[in-house]
Regions:
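Membrane-embedded helix-loop-helix hairpins and adjacent transmembrane boundary segments
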Residues: 1-509, 519, 528-532
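Hydrophobic alpha-helical transmembrane segments
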Residues: 511-513
Length: 535
């Protein structure tokens, strides 16, 4: 057997062992199968939140964007996703408390509890399911491309292999098997990506020298707004805006809010999130930038395979295969959570399953995995464009109904339904290119219209059926922190530094170093904010 295939199979069998190990425990109850008993500790929650969110997009999409756009893509991801962790407190902390008190299992359980509308609950779940399916296919697409590029496995064979193993261990072990594989895969993703980064930097001629060469040939890759002006102000701001509203609406992340042992456990994840995003996202974007030196003329479609191409160029067959398992870990750790969460929503929100009847749940996991694979048969041109046009915008539309439901007593079912219908109609219109907004991402007008519809319809309609007893008030001390986080957000949009020829320090533009520091500052701000909250 080819040594490269053997390495991949050993890794996959190792992940399968977790499913087998937790098989008996997963049969105890739905809470155990879907939520791991609601008692995840700090370390496990941090790794499962990070690994679940950092998908194939993080490895292949970011490196591809680094190749095409340059370092201009790094801050909108590193700082933008780190700043997004504030929503883990705004939304996640409240969902954690309510889920324990009121026995939520799926994201739409909160929607039904708050708005007392079965139609709205099903609509909310349907939107999550429809817009997450393409994201599942992204993991299959990336696995097929990476295995094809590195070890020559046919694209569909690689996609089917990874999808099949993920479906198997999820069906066997439930969330507890996922959490422990997330811990292992999260470590692999970070350590192996770091090793790949160091090897590529060293063998391409040295980090600083390689960047100087890239800067001489393509200065826009180290400048803003990036290669070909890809990241103008409106797009830059739009991405930061998008992550804040879209990421907490990922059903697999939303459900993770319910599994923390306590609020302090969730707070630990919030504090360290900007650190891990600033570090890991830099590595993957930087690998793409350095790839310009080794492969200067890739087609747009081929840019998403720059990571395995560089491993093939600069490492041995065995080492390259070992390191690529880190990227496979990234996509598996997202796919497994998506499959389990969507299964919980389909079986709980649309069908009634008798106690301890797990067969339908496992069949649902298999069906979802199959659908994701079928979408991957005809992959889109680039990972970034595909999910930006579908998943992120479609899920972000749900945020006003959730945030308004948590904090605004006047919010009602009519406003929530209208906001979702208006928002998704705009998502479809943008996707079909019936609407165009030059120089700004669609998410900005979409969220503006969605929020306006939610507020106006709630104000001008009456409904006495809502459960307003679970609405939270905003503490005065929390309001004092609004200016602090506003300033940090403005600092993350440092447009006053744009358009200048960058000064390089250690091969990197000074503004990239600025964002390293800003990520650390954001983490410290989260720490102080969450500490003072408990005083």
């Amino acid at each position: 057997m080819d040594l490269r295939i053997l390495v991949i199979l050993v890794y996959l069998l190792f992940t399968l062992a977790f499913g087998i190990g937790f098989r008996k425990r997963a049969k105890e109850s739905k809470v155990e199968f879907f939520l791991a008993g609601r008692n995840l500790t700090k370390l496990l929650l941090f790794f499962t939140m990070a690994a679940t969110n950092f998908s194939a997009f993080t490895i292949f999409g970011f490196s591809g964007a680094g190749y095409r756009i340059g370092y201009s893509f790094y801050p909108v991801m590193g700082f933008g996703t780190g700043f997004m962790a504030l929503s883990f407190h705004i939304i996640g902390g409240k969902i954690l408390k309510l889920s324990r008190d009121r026995d939520y299992i799926t994201p739409s359980d909160f929607i039904f509890d708050r708005y007392q509308s079965l139609f709205l609950k099903k609509l909310f779940s349907l939107v999550m399911i429809v817009f997450t399916l393409p994201y599942i296919s992204i993991q299959a697409i990336a696995s097929g491309k990476s295995l094809e590029s590195l070890i020559g496995l046919p694209y569909l064979g690689g996609a089917l292999l990874i999808t099949g193993f993920v479906v198997t261990y999820v069906a066997l072990g439930g969330l507890r098997s996922i959490v422990w594989t997330d811990f292992m895969q999260g470590l692999m993703m970070v350590l192996f990506t770091l090793c790949a980064f160091l090897i590529i930097a060293s063998r391409s001629g040295g980090f600083a020298a390689t960047h100087q060469g890239v800067f001489n040939a393509h200065p826009d890759l180290l400048s803003r707004p990036g290669m070909g002006g890809a990241m103008p102000y409106g797009v830059w701001f739009g991405y930061l805006f998008l992550w804040f509203f879209a990421d907490p609406m990922f059903p697999q992340l939303f459900q993770r809010f319910m599994v923390a042992k306590d609020e302090e456990t969730l707070n630990t994840t919030i504090v360290f999130y900007p650190i891990i995003t600033s570090f890991l996202f830099f590595l993957t974007v930087s690998i793409g930038v350095m790839g310009r030196g080794a492969f200067p003329d890739l087609s747009r479609e081929a840019t998403d395979t720059i990571f395995p191409m560089l491993l093939g160029q600069y490492t041995s067959v065995f080492l390259g295969t070992v390191l690529i398992t880190g990227s496979i870990a990234a996509l598996m750790s997202t796919m497994d959570s998506q499959l389990l969460t969507l299964t919980s929503m389909i079986t709980s929100d649309f069908f009634t399953i008798r106690r301890n009847e797990v067969l339908k749940e496992k069949i649902t996991i298999i069906v979802l995995g199959t659908l994701g694979f079928l979408i991957a048969i005809r992959p889109p041109q680039t990972i970034l464009e595909f999910i930006s046009a579908t998943t992120f915008n479609g899920l972000a539309v749900l945020a006003p109904a959730v945030i308004g439901g948590l904090y605004w007593k006047s919010a009602n079912r009519y406003g929530a339904v209208t906001s979702i219908l208006v928002g998704e109609s705009m998502v479809i219109a943008y996707y079909l290119q019936l609407i165009h907004t030059k120089g700004i991402l669609p998410i900005v007008p979409i969220i503006a219209a969605t929020t306006a519809a939610f507020v106006l319809v709630s104000l001008f309609t009456k409904s006495d059926k809502e459960n307003r007893h679970i609405v939270f008030s905003i503490h005065r001390r929390a309001l004092l922190w609004i200016p602090v986080f506003t300033v940090l957000f403005v600092l993350g949009n440092d447009f006053w530094n744009w358009g200048r020829r960058p000064l390089l320090l250690g091969g990197l533009p000074l503004w990239v170093w600025y964002y390293f520091g800003l990520g650390i500052l954001l983490s410290l701000a989260f720490k102080l904010f969450l500490q003072r909250k408990h005083v």
